[in-house]
Regions:
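Short polar/acidic secondary-structure junctions
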Residues: 18, 82-83
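Amphipathic alpha-helical dimerization/coiled-coil segments
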Residues: 11-12, 98-109
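A short, conserved structural fragment
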Residues: 64-82
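N-terminal helix-turn-helix DNA-binding core of bacterial DNA-binding proteins
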Residues: 14-52
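DNA major-groove recognition helix of helix-turn-helix
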Residues: 60
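Short, Lys/Arg-enriched N-terminal segment that forms or immediately precedes the first helix
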Residues: 2-18
């Protein structure tokens, strides 16, 4: 990816939250890339991005509709129980998240 395109992507994401950290952006792009339709397991995000469970949870909630303090958040992601194993959580894009992801994906190319 062209570094100029990467900077454009970061600028666009930060329009939603000017304090958004690189980890949160990485989680958003991971979910958009690997869990666009069916979602992705939180454990898989941990493993593939080499993040701890608390880091993944914190970043997912920053990007969700409601954060962990029960306040309105960005609204890019939502979590749900894995239908195959209810103890596991999956993460997917909201319709807003899909719109933003698609527009950012276009910037990357």
């Amino acid at each position: 990816m062209n570094p100029k395109n990467l900077l454009k992507i970061i600028e666009e994401v930060r329009k939603f939250d000017d304090q958004m950290e690189a980890q949160a952006i990485a989680v958003f792009f991971y979910v958009g890339t690997y869990g666009y339709n069916d979602g992705v397991l939180m454990q898989q995000i941990q493993k593939d991005l080499s993040l701890g469970q608390s880091s993944v949870s914190r970043n997912v909630y920053k990007l969700a509709d409601i954060n962990r303090h029960k306040k309105k958040a960005i609204g890019f992601l939502y979590t749900f129980d894995d239908p195959m194993e209810r103890r596991r959580k999956k993460v997917s894009l909201t319709s807003k998240g899909k719109r933003v992801f698609n527009s950012l994906k276009d910037l990357a190319s």
